[in-house]
Amino acid sequence: MSRVGKKPIEIPAGVTVTVNGNTVTVKGPKGELTRTFHPDMTITVEGNVITVTRPSDEKHHRALHGTTRSLLANMVEGVSKGYEKALELVGVGYRASKQGKKLVLSVGYSHPVEIEPEEGLEIEVPSQTKIIVKGADKQRVGELAANIRAVRPPEPYKGKGIRYEGELVRLKEGKTGK
């Protein structure tokens, strides 16, 4: 059996899980997430534990088993604790600010770049060079953070741009003059 797939998922207090066929709804203090899983996977809720079982040991069932369990665990953690991804701006004059819900980036273009977060996601700007993306859905938090980073990814010579917090940017050697 898949080592990831056979681990049961504990449901923390304040989180409710509803299974309707192959659609699972998880409600918690940070929000509500719904996802439809592959019909071959059997998801059962007993007390405060979720278990995922598979019909056979075929390769695609083994793969689906671990994936389904991980996605469910991420949903449960997302509605109870939430996810956040931090980004930092490196570069002279690179600034981030908030106008209402919109994130406004001035990162060396002739115009400020505005990014509107989707429903269920939140952007915080604790300082002009730091951005924090928060939300219950791990995938959507990561996707929004990646979209913000894509506005001005770190360049390889000086390292200027938007990077994830703690991301190491390998710098290249410049051309040596004669």
UniProtKB/Swiss-Prot annotation:
Keywords attached to this entry: Ribonucleoprotein, Ribosomal protein, RNA-binding, rRNA-binding
Species lineage: Bacteria, Bacillati, Bacillota, Bacilli, Bacillales
Role: It is located near the subunit interface in the base of the L7/L12 stalk, and near the tRNA binding site of the peptidyltransferase center. This protein binds to the 23S rRNA, and is important in its secondary structure.
Protein name per its UniProtKB record: Large ribosomal subunit protein uL6
GO terms, biological process: cytoplasmic translation
Single GO term (MF): rRNA binding
Pfam families registered for this protein in UniProt: Ribosomal_L6
Family statement drawn from the similarity comment of this UniProt entry: Belongs to the universal ribosomal protein uL6 family.
Complexes and interactors: Part of the 50S ribosomal subunit.
Gene name for this UniProt entry: rplF
Superkingdom in the source lineage: Bacteria
GO cellular component terms, semicolon-separated: cytosolic large ribosomal subunit
Organism of derivation: Geobacillus stearothermophilus
Gene3D superfamilies the UniProt entry points to: Ribosomal protein L6, alpha-beta domain
